[in-house]
Amino acid sequence: AFSQRRLLRSLMNVRPPMPLAPEFLKVQDALLSAEREEKGVVDGDALPPTAGDPRLVLCQGDITRLRADAIVDADNSALLGCFAPCHGCIDNAIHTFAGMQLRLVCDELMRAQGHDEPVGRAQVTSAFNLPSRFVVHTVGPQVPTREPTAAQVEQPASCYRASPAAAAAARDAPLAFCCI
């Protein structure tokens, strides 16, 4: 079963955004729902706030298990998720466990936009099969050297500012951030 699930995840990861048969989506959604229940869901509202700010919660764990209004994905500039089979990045996990609908919706967003998503901006989509309601997609900096430029140092802050603004535009939703 583990090797079959790994094969399915690999195929989901490499598949380009193309329409899917309703029958396939029904089976995929049932599988992802069963997997979500097996892994367990963490209720974001039940996590204790930090001592410094009652609005802030720090949690180490799998963001794809978190029931929250919105989770933030450190995405690539195409917003299509990671295409590397079973890669360990957060982008791969979010796109895998949300289901293949997420890649399709992101592709529609990007086609309508007409260009790659700039670093430090954000877009909101449904979370589909994740326990959260929305996914906020933001693109962090790519630092090919060990020494980031001054602009690259500022870019994560832009992501952290743009994500709540994007969520507020969709709905005033509390956010769960991954590291960007």
Model features per residue range: what roles?
Residues 1-180:
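Macrodomain-like recognition of ADP-ribose-binding/processing modules
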